[in-house]
């Protein structure tokens, strides 16, 4: 655990209406360069002890060195999964897979007019970033996995959900365990 005395604990204010989260406001400070450098050193030291590495980028500055971390992990033969953030995915190049949600994917590649257009845009992004795969979570439309050998679409089972917080985290964690155990992508 890295401690940065200059950083206060993030406080998250959630605004709820009719049992659903309407918005969240975060009060926080950015970690120092020294703390981030120490985190990178700790990551490198612990890397041999894992089979897969999961990065959830919340855009808060904690993954400033993610490009280097991905490079180190892949060089060590590790599976690297990234839940991305923002509109520039170049820093995730070389990961095994990234898992943007539908709106994050649109932010990066633009709108698509149909499934064929989405497949084309996903293939272009996957190739540009040298990824093995790209998984787009699509809310009520399920999820779509894009690999060099084609696309796989998994439909969603509709449910009334009051708070979708953590849904993407659940997807990437499940995928990490499956891939670390040698499961086939299609499973």
Label every model-predicted segment:
Residues 1-52:
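Conserved N-terminal subdomain of the carbohydrate kinase-like
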Residues 13, 53-56, 143, 168, ...:
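Buried hydrophobic positions in well-ordered alpha/beta secondary-structure cores of metabolic enzymes
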Residues 27-29, 55-58, 177:
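Short glycine-centered, acidic/aromatic-flanked micro-motifs in structured strand/loop junctions
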Residues 52, 60-151:
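Conserved phosphate/ATP/ADP-binding segment of small-molecule kinases
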């Amino acid at each position: 655990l890295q401690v940065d005395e200059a950083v206060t604990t993030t406080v998250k204010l959630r605004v709820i209406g009719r049992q659903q989260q309407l918005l969240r406001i975060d009060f926080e400070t950015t970690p120092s360069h020294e703390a981030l450098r120490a985190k990178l050193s700790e990551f490198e030291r612990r890397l041999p002890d894992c089979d897969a590495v999961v990065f959830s980028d919340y855009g808060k500055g904690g993954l400033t060195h993610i490009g280097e971390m991905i490079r180190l992990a892949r060089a060590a033969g590790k599976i690297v999964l990234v839940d991305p953030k923002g509109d520039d995915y170049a820093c995730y190049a070389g990961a095994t897979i990234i898992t943007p949600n539908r709106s994050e994917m649109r932010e990066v590649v633009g709108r698509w007019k149909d499934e064929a257009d989405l497949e084309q845009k996903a293939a272009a992004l996957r190739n540009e970033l040298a990824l093995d795969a790209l998984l787009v979570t699509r809310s009520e439309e399920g999820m779509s996995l894009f690999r060099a050998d084609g696309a796989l679409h998994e439909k969603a089972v509709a449910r009334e959900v009051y708070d979708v917080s953590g849904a993407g985290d659940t997807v990437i964690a499940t995928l990490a365990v499956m891939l670390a155990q040698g499961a086939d992508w299609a499973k």
